[in-house]
């Protein structure tokens, strides 16, 4: 039964979730991505848990030998700050979920019409990952250390899909005010795409608003201007990379959205009082 009054994209995902939860026998093994010592070029790594579900065809994770051929019904759970490198040369329909603290991100990929870099459909819905949802995600993250416990893992993922279905079936009028949700959506999107060449104009265009509207959102709902927020996110990512990974300063700058490593070093030193090299030395010792 279709939920009443849902926008077209939201109804599309509502139908997808209905097909999944009403046919659990079609769901297969749940695989788990891990956190690599270094991040290969092209790999995906964000601060939120993710779940990729193969709806049709073949998918895979090139970072794990046993995960390079995932077939219809199989799933890949990527804990927060874990990474995957998608196989993108096979015919596939894929549903990808992102579990952020205040929103649920849904993307549908169809290799017949788009690549795995560009979703055919994509929405973000307000959803506080607290209580039941947070407990499920925490449990799955812990179970990633015991991936063979499929008799526990699969029912847990099915319960998570039921919860997602309830979020997707919620009419937009029952959600938080649009301005607040849009502001948090932009902030979270920047956290996922900080390595890209972001400008006020390009981000505003992506969210189908004017640059002035974007600036107004940050003035009303945030504590810093948009460009300052982008710089803050990039600096936070740079600190994390410098603490955990043995990369050149040029590589760190590139991964954090700074094509000019000299400018990256100046910004980093101005913000933290140390050069990136000095900061890294404190942790890499």
UniProtKB/Swiss-Prot annotation:
SUPFAM superfamilies: Homeodomain-like (SSF46689). This is Uncharacterized HTH-type transcriptional regulator YpdC. Transmembrane segments: none annotated. Residues 201-222, 249-272 bind DNA. Disulfide bonds: none annotated. Keywords: DNA-binding, Transcription, Transcription regulation. GO terms for molecular function: DNA-binding transcription factor activity; sequence-specific DNA binding.
């Amino acid at each position: 039964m279709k939920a009443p009054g849902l926008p077209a994209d939201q109804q599309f995902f509502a139908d997808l979730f209905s097909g999944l939860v009403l046919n659990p026998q079609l769901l297969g093994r749940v695989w788990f991505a891990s956190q690599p010592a270094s991040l290969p070029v092209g790999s995906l790594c964000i601060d939120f848990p993710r779940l990729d579900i193969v709806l049709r065809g073949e998918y895979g994770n090139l970072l794990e030998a046993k995960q390079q051929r995932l077939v219809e019904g199989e799933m890949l759970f990527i804990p927060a700050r874990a990474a995957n490198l998608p196989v993108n040369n096979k015919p596939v329909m894929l549903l990808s979920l992102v579990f952020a603290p205040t929103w649920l991100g849904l993307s549908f990929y169809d290799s017949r019409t788009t690549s795995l870099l560009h979703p055919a459909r994509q929405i973000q819905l307000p959803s506080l990952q607290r209580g039941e949802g947070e407990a499920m995600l925490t449990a799955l993250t812990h179970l990633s250390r015991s991936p063979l416990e499929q008799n526990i893992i699969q029912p847990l993922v099915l319960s998570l899909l039921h919860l997602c279905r309830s979020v997707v079936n919620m009419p937009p009028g029952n959600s938080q005010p649009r301005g607040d949700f849009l502001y948090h959506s932009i902030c979270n999107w920047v956290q996922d795409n900080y390595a890209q060449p972001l400008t006020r104009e390009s981000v505003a265009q992506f969210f189908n608003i004017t640059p002035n509207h974007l600036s107004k959102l940050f003035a009303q709902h945030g504590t810093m201007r948009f460009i300052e927020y982008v710089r803050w996110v990039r600096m936070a990512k740079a600190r994390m990379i410098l603490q955990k990974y043995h990369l050149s300063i040029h590589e760190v700058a590139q991964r954090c959205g700074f094509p000019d490593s000299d400018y990256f070093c100046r910004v980093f030193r101005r913000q933290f009082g140390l050069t990136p090299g000095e900061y890294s030395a404190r942790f890499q010792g």
